[in-house]
Structures are given as structure tokens and as C-alpha cells.
Amino acid sequence: MMKQRFTSAATSINSKKAPAVYSMKKAVEAMTGRKVVDIGGGRYDTGAEAARAYGATVSVYDPYNRTAEHNEIVLAGAYDVAVISNVLNVIDSEAARANVLKLAGSLAPVVLVTVYEGDGTGTGRQTAADSWQENRRTASYIEEVERALEGFAVVRAGKLIIAERR
């Protein structure tokens, strides 16, 4: 995996509340009863806990907030759906974002992407010593997702991007 200039490890903040993707209607439909890998899912298991309510089993992969041993086990698994929630927006390099997307696409035939839009200006900036924010609207990621996930059909449903292997 490509080294990121900003790890944005400190942006793992949802200790009490599950990320929004775990309650978005179309995302819930895609995850119900399925095995899910959450790429960059952070140090907390709030998403996995929320997904249990609709029969999804979630494994979190996060090179900055989980141990190498944990991540190895997760990467060895087989999944129906990959989630990338509020991860692409904290990576300052398109090449590194593409690596995250390609990893997700290699692990599952369905990839669900959400981003935090920040101030929505589209002007990325450093937000802390080791953190970055792209400040881009969800729609602005579509072409990037399409480029990274060749062979996937990519659509946007509001603040959710859904990529399905053709």
C-alpha cells in the first residue's frame, strides 16, 4: 500500500455513534445478511454493532487504527460488500485514494463509498498535524471511483456511491 503523507489516524472519532453509511437505506439493503469489510473503519466497532441489527457481519481493516495481525486476518477473509466511509476525503493523493478503492474492489463485488464533504469548497487543506480534508462534494468523487474500479458500474444515490462489479 502506498504511503500517505497524512495518516489521518486521529480522524477516527465515532466512539459512540455508527458512521452514517450503516443507516443509509440503499447501503443497508446492500449489506443486509452479508459479510462486509470496512476499509479504514477506524478504531471503534460502532459500524459492526449497528450492522448486526440487519444481519450483516462487519470486519474492520485499518492500517492506522488496528494491529498488523488484525488486518492480516481481515484481508484473508471473503466479503460480499466493502465499505469506504469517510476515508477518501482524508487522503490528499489521488493515487493513494485509488489504492484504497482497488483494495476494496479486490475484496468484494460491491463497494459502498461515503465521504465527509467538509466545507464543500473542493479546496483540500491540512486540518491538523497529521490530518487532511479534501472538502469535496460526493459527486466529485464519481470519476475517480470509476477510474480506480475498472469493470464496476458506478452510481450515486444522494451521499452514497455504489460500485458493483459487472
PLM features: residue spans?
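Class I (Rossmann-like) S-adenosyl-L-methionine-dependent methyltransferase catalytic domain
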Residues: M1-L75, V110-R166
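Catalytic P-loop NTPase motifs of RecA-like helicase/translocase cores
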Residues: T67, V90-I91
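A conserved beta-strand element that flanks and buttresses the S-adenosyl-L-methionine
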Residues: V83-N86
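Flexible, active-site-proximal loop/turn residues at the rims of small-molecule/cofactor binding pockets
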Residues: L88, V100, E117
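A short, conserved alpha-helix within the catalytic core of class I
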Residues: I91-L103
